[in-house]
Amino acid sequence: MTRHQLVHQSIRIHVDDAYLEGDLHVPPSPVGMVLFAHGSGSSRLSPRNNYVAARLQENGIGTLLIDLLTADEDRDFSIRFDIELLTLRLAAAVNWIRLNEDIQSHALGLFGASTGAAAALQLAAFYRQGQDDGIAAVVSRGGRPDLASQEALQTIVAPTLLIVGGEDRSVISLNEQAYVLMRCEKRLQIIPGATHLFEESGALEKVSELAVSWFLRYLASPTLPNQKIAR
């Protein structure tokens, strides 16, 4: 792989006794990389996440969509909501990126949906943003930040965008509570008329537009930990 090649390949990440399947797409001379964490009952084949990923790719951002659970694990409802396990699996994917010499130097963002957003927020709290192995930005789509710990929400330094559908009222409340706890640069964006899966006309397009803008802003020039950020 060189800087000027378009790369699209399937990958496997070995974690303990499991193999996680992933789809890697790296445009020529990428601005940065975004790792996707899907929600419960979904997978790397999620049409919604793939739509957002395609918009990121069109704007020069590489993407890795990964299955955080094996097929057998995903059949167990309790495992789907095991945020600690999902976070560990997401961390393994970050480590895979950081060990891949072709993409390891690029700024890294996380895009999480539903329970995957909780894992992304948990993981972001463990990395010092701006460092070589840090997380440069986080975007949550219909996320469940209530499943992340309060300590994690207060610890995150990566700029974080929370996107929620205007008709997803219970999740709006959960995101509003998380927003108050967070001390990083942050934004809560409500998409009018959208439900939890953003299936309404134009809703997913708006999500993609917001995600592209957020990642282009922060992957191109990550905020260093000692820089002043909005509270």
Language model feature labels by segment:
Residues 156, 162-164:
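Short beta-strand/loop motif that positions the catalytic acidic residue
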Residues 112-122:
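Glycine-rich nucleophile elbow surrounding the catalytic serine of serine-hydrolase chemistry
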Residues 11-103, 199-202, 206:
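Serine-hydrolase catalytic machinery in alpha/beta-hydrolase-like enzymes
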Residues 102-114:
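Alpha/beta-hydrolase fold nucleophile elbow
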Residues 169-174:
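Conserved alpha/beta-hydrolase "acid-adjacent" motif
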Residues 131-145:
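A conserved short beta-strand
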Residues 202-231:
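Catalytic active-site module of serine/aspartate enzymes centered on a nucleophile-bearing elbow/loop
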Residues 182-197:
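Catalytic histidine neighborhood in serine/cysteine hydrolases
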